[in-house]
């Protein structure tokens, strides 16, 4: 998605459990096929009851598989914990009520290049990558 599309799509405040939490637009990333969208953005959790559980708001209009997790179209929040120098545990929750969806492992990306707070790459043959800093995990568009 280009900057104008992101501005029209990313909410200033994301609906997270019983709160409306401010988003950090400069960290937003998303993709679209012109009809459906997948996007994510860092949320500013200071002063909320996040307890470090979540740091990002994520919305998909289509069914996805992220790592081994299946996500229906909808709104999610996720956070991560560093397991070691090579891996993060990324945990997804439903944004509406904080219900745990599950966790996956993100691994260090070895390719050189820019590092983003969040980057959702467009898919090739229905597969793409989501980057959190220099860590990455795969997603697959499901029909």
What label would you give each PLM region?
Residues 1-49, 98-143:
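Primarily secretory-pathway and cell-envelope proteins
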């Amino acid at each position: 998605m280009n900057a104008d599309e992101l501005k029209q799509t990313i909410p200033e405040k994301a609906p997270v459990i019983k709160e409306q939490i401010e988003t950090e637009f400069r960290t937003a990333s998303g993709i679209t096929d012109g009809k459906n969208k997948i996007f994510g953005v860092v949320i500013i959790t200071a002063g909320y009851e996040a307890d470090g559980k979540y740091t990002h708001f994520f919305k998909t209009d289509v069914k996805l598989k992220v790592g081994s997790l299946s996500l229906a179209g909808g709104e999610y929040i996720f956070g991560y914990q560093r397991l070691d120098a090579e891996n993060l545990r990324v945990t997804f929750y439903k944004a509406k009520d904080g219900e745990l969806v599950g966790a996956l492992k993100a691994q260090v990306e070895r390719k050189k290049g820019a590092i983003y707070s969040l980057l959702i790459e467009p898919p090739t043959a229905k597969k793409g990558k989501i980057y959190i800093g220099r860590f990455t995990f795969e997603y697959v568009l499901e029909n």
